């Protein structure tokens, strides 16, 4: 055999070796993909963490009431977990770190999901937050002067609730082409009283009340800011569309203990308690879910 023939035969082995390396790499990659793609999702046990908004102390009381008086009948134990950052909380629910959250209404959830793409679903209306108009200067809405300065929430979902309230009592008109529950200041088409609107974070409103004519927000926030409830000049019935929702990660909705969780929150004993409780963190702050 010549040296030339030996060189050719030796060279011909390399394509086969290269192909073998590629095949082994593909097999390894497929195995990795399969192990990750088929990794089991979170499976919830009978002890479930439920998130609440720490600034809304009554929400914690709701979870604790259900845990003590209702959840045992469904074979569950609930643990209330307070997290201030709403996006962090919703991410934790979507990822299965928490079984659910009760801090938001459907319009806030839509805002969060649209911005972050979380897989979350509303399930059961839990309660409604008392929401109204406060003033340090006037004793009724009718007393608000022409050109009064009114503070509304600076976040889209709750600003819509404030403006819809003003439209329902005839003080402003909103663009009929816009969903009123998500309206913004730019959607005001009629302002016969010449109100001047300012935007503030809900938690800041109580501190600013003495520098404006009126502010619109949640009773719980004004309570937390030590604003007496007699500073409230209008508390209309809370509309169901802004009810707190038990929000669950969409992939987990059919799990046995999540179904039981939904049943526990839908138990009529909760609404009866909300109606009759004397707990100062709940009474007049979180109210039963209305029919409309």
Please name every model-derived segment.
Residues 29-32, 157-182, 262-292:
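Ligand-binding clefts/hinges and TM-proximal coupling segments of bilobed small-molecule sensing domains
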Residues 42-77:
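Short, polar/charged alpha-helical segment
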Residues 84-86, 96-110, 127, 201-202, ...:
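Beta->alpha turn/N-cap motifs
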Residues 111-123, 136-138, 209-211, 216, ...:
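Ligand-binding "clamshell"
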Residues 123-173, 271-272:
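A conserved helix-loop-strand patch within extracytoplasmic ligand-binding domains
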